[in-house]
Amino acid sequence: MSFTAAPTESFDVIVVGGGHAGCEAAITTARLGLNTALFSLNLDRIAWQPCNPAVGGPAKSQLVHEVDALGGVIGRLADATAIQKRTLNASRGPAVWALRAQTDKRLYSRQMLQLLQHTPNLALREAMVTGLEVEGEEEQQRIQGVRTYFGSVYAAQAVVLTAGTFLGGRIWVGHQSMAAGRAGEQAAEGLTETLQGLGFHTDRLKTGTPARVDRRSIALDQLEEQPSDAADRFFSFDPAAWVSGEQMSCHITRTTAETHQLIRDNLHLTAIYGGVIDSKGPRYCPSIEDKIVRFADKESHQIFLEPEGRDTPEIYVQGFSTGLPEPIQLQLLRSLPGLEQAVMLRPAYSVDYDYLPATQLKPSLETKRVSGLFSAGQLNGTTGYEEAAAQGLVAGLNAARLIGEQDPVYFPREGSYIGTMIDDLVSQDLREPYRVLTSRSEYRLILRGDNADRRLTPLGRDLGLIDDRRWQLFEEKLQAMDAEKKRLESTRLKVSDPIAPTVEEETGAPIKGSITLADLLRRPAMHAADLVRHGLADGDLPLPVREGAEIDIKYSGYLQRQQQQIDQVKRQSQRKLPSDLNYTNIGTLSNEAREKLSAIQPTTLGQANRIPGVSQADITALLMWLELQKRQPLAPTTQAR
């Protein structure tokens, strides 16, 4: 191995970046026994929440449950630092139920730092990584370490890049800008150029965050209060992580005609509408300017005022991110009811940054160009702490397996939201920040938050991510659920029982002789909580056990049907494609399909089917070609590597 300078230290794995992806990656590799170093520009801002200090929400909470089911930490920390929790979409079906927690951002960061500091095999270093040490040429390149701004070299067998918005980061307030990854923190230099020099394509994306306002300057008594409604619900499946702390309320205000007119009059002063930058921002988290332009017929938009912690007066003004100049921002804030005397503690800003389009990655999140180099989080074009944490765990896991000469772990899209997200990232040419959504999954009834442990904890155990205590808890939960389902199927409510008339009235259906509690649960108006209320179930049974049993029974027909669909799709979509397949030599493919397939090099037929520009006719042609190759050698149609 040759280095540009003698290595200062050597590690098995180096993680570059101390955000949510980096922390999960570093903890994962360290727990798997690898000597790991996490490099951060600022160790005082570990796992910082620079935008909304919240975890969860639709699809995002499912990701958090999945990460926890695999032994990750984001759910545990969210439970420990939550200052408000709410259940979203509770009136709809379980496929879209979601838990969202407002967290104490400073406490979250401190607890993550403490966790990192007390994790065996894990070292922390504060430095700016500006270069990569790579050996070999072209297709045979392999990572061997990193270089820092001040010239130190650190050796590693695997490197995980989790640079967030810091690569070439530039923050904007109006037309004014400065180099920064986020407000008050320097951008990372050199790494983008290093990646480009290795043959990677990079591009630019944009995100933004709203102003912070002093709570003491807001007339909260004039606004609608939004209290916590889910204090007894948690992200983690481990009861030892459950913390029921004091809950705080959020408040709701709305934009006014004055707000909208101020924005229309000053659109040209933003970096985007003024034509200064053209980076794409997140579709599902638009600035207030975008809302006014896109929904010009809407008279008002809801704005949430969310506390950033128990010991700070800072209020996050959700739904009000803006790229307007600072003086106009204050005018906008004071146009909102209840904020007429608002004191702005921090202005809103947007940030544009370099990212690495994830079609250059394998489903393991290892780069295709450089062996041992992994990428995770916002660097891959995603937005959100939850998306970052999930990718960090996957990248860390597969970095460890690469070093251990084990096969990578690929998460199929039909098995988890983690798999859905990664499949989307590596298969699609995304041009805007990617956010996980329940609508992105074809199998969302199966991929619920409540059953993430049943879907993924056995895998986590096999991979060495779940310890004996967690595994015992998991087995005990399964046994309790099985016993409760059997009880519900065998216990009958008779029409002569005293509670029967009340049950008939509530469900709107008669009881003919008798009915099992399971069939009673299948009635739309009856739920596990109602059984407890009527003395038909044990209220001391853990809530996850009662609700899990209810969902399995109430939706059994739908669940079986969707599982059959998944099994059918699996048989075809998981068919492997040769990694060195030369698509240009398959004459039955369209020109566009050849180009797209050659660029992305999908690992399975299912992944190929989801690449934009690859038609069903192309998939049929590819399938026919694969069948032909069973009787012919592959050599004439593969690339020499």
From Swiss-Prot:
GO terms for cellular component: cytoplasm. Keywords: Cytoplasm, FAD, Flavoprotein, NAD, tRNA processing. The keyword Flavoprotein applies. InterPro entries: FAD/NAD-bd_sf, GIDA_C_N, MnmG, MnmG-rel, MnmG-rel_CS, MnmG_C, MnmG_C_subdom, MnmG_C_subdom_sf. FAD binds at G17, G18, G19, H20, A21, G22. Its cofactor is FAD. Its main location: cytoplasm. One of its GO terms (biological process) is tRNA methylation. NAD(+) binds at residues 281-295. SUPFAM superfamilies: FAD/NAD(P)-binding domain. It is found in: Cytoplasm. Disulfide bonds: none annotated. GO terms for molecular function: flavin adenine dinucleotide binding. Pfam families: GIDA (PF01134), GIDA_C_1st (PF21680), SAM_GIDA_C (PF13932). The keyword Flavoprotein applies. NAD-binding protein involved in the addition of a carboxymethylaminomethyl (cmnm) group at the wobble position (U34) of certain tRNAs, forming tRNA-cmnm(5)s(2)U34. Belongs to the MnmG family. Homodimer. Heterotetramer of two MnmE and two MnmG subunits. This is tRNA uridine 5-carboxymethylaminomethyl modification enzyme MnmG. The lineage of its organism: Bacteria, Bacillati, Cyanobacteriota, Cyanophyceae, Synechococcales. The gene is mnmG.
